[in-house]
Amino acid sequence: MRKIYLTTLLVIAAAAGGVTDAFCCTGFVAGKDATADGCRIIARTEDLSGAHNKIFKVYPRRKRKKPVVFTDAIGFSIELPRLSYQYTAICDAEQSEGIYDEVGFNEYGVAMSATVSASPGKAAQEADPLVPNGLSEASITTVVLPYITTAREGIERIAHIVDTHGAAEGNILFIADHKESWYMEILSGHQYAAVKVPEDSYAVVPNHFLLDNVDISSKDVIASKDLINLPKAKGFYKEFGGAFHAALTYGEEIGDYDCVRLWGGQNKLSPSEKVSYDTKVFSLWRKADKKITLEDVMELQRYRYEDTDKNANLAENACIRPIGAPTSMECHIIQMKPELPQSVGGVMWLAMANAEHSVYLPFYGNITDTLQPYKVEDVLYNPASFYWLMRSINIISALNRDMYGKNIRAYWKNYEQKLIQEQNAKDAEIIRLYEKKGKKAAAKYATKLGCEQAADAFEKAQTIYAELMNFAAQNEGRMPRKAFEPLAAERK
């Protein structure tokens, strides 16, 4: 199981004198009134390893003759319904430890991103231990997203699974549809809490529980029946500000690994708040100083605190955990667009590998296929793979960000700006097709558009990598006289 592998590496790294920035995800959510375009956003960087291929694929709708029993690598087993809906997913290429369908849309326009790992505290684990063969990140999307029609249904399905099978890990996840977004924390073996995302707020989510006062009587809350009773009975119940605090009760004490991402992300979007690095209890929900744009979230997922004294690009800050980590295997931003037909759902902006020198490309939720480079399953480097190509560009770019990476990042930013500017016209076209010709015509358009845009970006990335390798080879052992310029011939 991946969590066991990560825990072992963290222990080794800590014993060696510090935890690296190698291991876990960072999430982000925002309500529709917090964003500039009125879209709800759920987003995450999937972080584990700098050499871990991911596949972007579409699972077709399936109707089986009888229910099937699903069993994963750690022994979690569950009977699944006969009918599974079509869904998109970004899964592991090598699946000996699990599928890890990390994010996607289903045919009902429901989007799910799972998970951000988090650890229960010692008292919580003693009172309600994690279940070795319970629900884990490896399988959660696979056994939930194809079987739900709303975000609330998704939360309720997870709650039922944790009630009956238990959880193998502490996890944080997000589910959204055209009406609402939900934020959920699986806090221990059988305890959990989920809340609707406030429409006027955002949250930056490191590997740390953050839920505060959970009003279990609210219709906007779904929680385990013993969420409060258990810690009261076992003596680890905690309050903050005179009310029950879920994260303080169930979680670990926050450390630098998580603190720096909360501090960095909240100050980037809410600089007027002047959030202190020494904050002992961080607020989950914040209000941004200005409406949050798609570009803001892209930059957040690339953020290495460059404008602070904790700039992770400096040698003296090598142990600081940035949000934009080199170990991101993919980074995604989902915009839930209420004007789109429900079956279209919204748009996922996907950057393969780490986002710093990669490019975000848009995909509608109703696509039926992806470009072949997204489906290359090689565990070892393969230049035909979208993941491996973008990872290669990132590796070389990070060797000298000023001379190699700066102009690549600028090139992709301009490329993304053009796509963003064109997106409203594409939204209008898919709505027109859906209304005039129906669901299949809209899906055909979405699939063709997604593949064409990805093909163009992949071709440009191939050229950039070839030029960059040539530039680096020519300048090996000496400082280049000027910075690398990608696709210079294109601009002549």
Across the structure, where does each feature detected by a protein language model lie?
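C-terminal segment of classical bacterial N-terminal signal peptides
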Residues: A14-A22
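Histidine-centered catalytic/metal-binding microenvironments
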Residues: K413-K492
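Short, well-structured alpha-helical segments that form the helix of a local strand-helix-strand
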Residues: G154-D163, V297-Q301
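Short, well-ordered beta-strand elements within core beta-sheets of diverse protein domains
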Residues: T141-Y147
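Bacterial N-terminal signal peptides that target proteins for export
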Residues: M1-T8
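A contiguous strand-loop segment
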Residues: F23-E137, R157-A288
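Substrate-recognition/cap regions that form aromatic- and gly/pro-loop-enriched pockets
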Residues: A312-K436
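Accessory, solvent-exposed terminal regions and/or long lumenal/extracellular loops of proteins
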Residues: L262-N317, R321-P326, Y415, Q421-R432
